[in-house]
């Protein structure tokens, strides 16, 4: 979702191909053998198959809302925060959402471990309106889809936690035009080879 958010805000033209991960098209596997989404094939022949790389690529082409940090060292700090999120929070999120996949009876321990990371976001949001600063930006788009997944796992529990700024931030994201646009359902792409 974060790659689609950046592609949308950048206005870069691209062809969206929705695929079923249970039946990955050969055309996709030829360009990105790892078989995960998203994958962006650029006209130069370059293949980007990491969502953050796609975000940077799209916003370097056009960043009308100023999502990319411009202050010295700000992008490095932003990428470090997202890396921490991806390595720590997402690990716990997956085990909280899908404990059976990891041989667990329940995911409460991982819910609580992920919550500790979310409290760092709450602290940041107490100082400024968005994670990126005075306006929505790269850091917000980089983590919001995963915070949404976490909240949706048990929304009643999430809403009862003492993180009002985080909850407001998430609701604003869920009610945004960008979110509505990227959540639009696309028909599955069928390869002409099929």
Summary of predicted features, one role per range:
Residues 185-194:
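Long, charge-rich low-complexity segments
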Residues 61-65, 153, 176:
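Phosphate/oxyanion-binding loops and surfaces in catalytic or ligand/nucleic-acid-binding neighborhoods
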Residues 1-112:
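GST-like domain detector, emphasizing the conserved glutathione-binding G-site
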Residues 77, 81-175:
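GST-like fold's C-terminal all-alpha helical module
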